[in-house]
Amino acid sequence: DTYVSVTKAGYIKRTSPRSFAASTLEEIGKRDDYRLIFVQTAKTTQHLLMFTTLGNVIYRPIHELADIRWKDIGEHLSQTITNFETNEEIIYAEVVDQFDDATTYFAATRLGQIKRVERKEFSPWRTYKSKSVKYAKLKDKTDQIVAVAPIKLDDVLLISQNGYALRFNIEEVPVVGSKAAGVKAMNLKAVDALQAAFICNTSSFYLLTQRGSLKRVSIEEIPATSRAKRGLQVLRELKNKPHRVFLAGAVAEQGFVGDLFSTEVEENDQTLLVQSNKGTIYESRLQDLNLSERTSNGSFISDTI
């Protein structure tokens, strides 16, 4: 076995269990722009898939990853992937056994498109060592992927920057080829954008605004309808200093195990760390938040923020 790690900025490596055990998770070799988004044990016979914010997927067999100590910086994807852009980031990564199963992913974009695509589309391609391939088509340079994850026949919840929420079943979204564009996910206003998309497999979700206000809302407050609608308001509009959605996601139930930034939450102790623009870090345990009304603006995480 080996430990595979991927950072948001695109540093990847595998590390021996011995090196991993001799360090803490925080001691990973890193640069200032680092955020670890994936770490998992894997066998050298398995495969790593990495999905980027620009709609590209990168493939690596685990045995081809550079074997690097936990405390040292990994290999940057731009060293080998010739079409890796300077503004490109990894949004989701996973280790897989095979490509011929029925796994399907959903991908949602900032400008309000959504699609489903099958894993078999990413069966290792001839030029994988030097080129990524498309998994989603973006509308223009301002567009990017806000969420991608494997999905079964669940509902998805979309939340826009201006505070609209829309829920529908993923069956409304056709399964298409990796290079195809998606369908309209949400009817966004001209000045709005999709900020979050996640699977409705828990009873509540959280929402953090750019002003530092946080709340937890019951999923039942957003009844399932159909795609391409505007949705329901989950923030009250203020004339002065309006709240805008900064981050949103599902709040885990007891007995799940997983990752706060995953679109499908499976974790039993979910803590949100928020860093202000002054560098102060605030900590909130999401399950401890009282349920708020759908249109409330939540509570500030600190009196001084």
Model-identified regions with their sequence ranges:
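Short, structured "edge-of-domain" segments at secondary-structure transitions
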Residues: 1-305
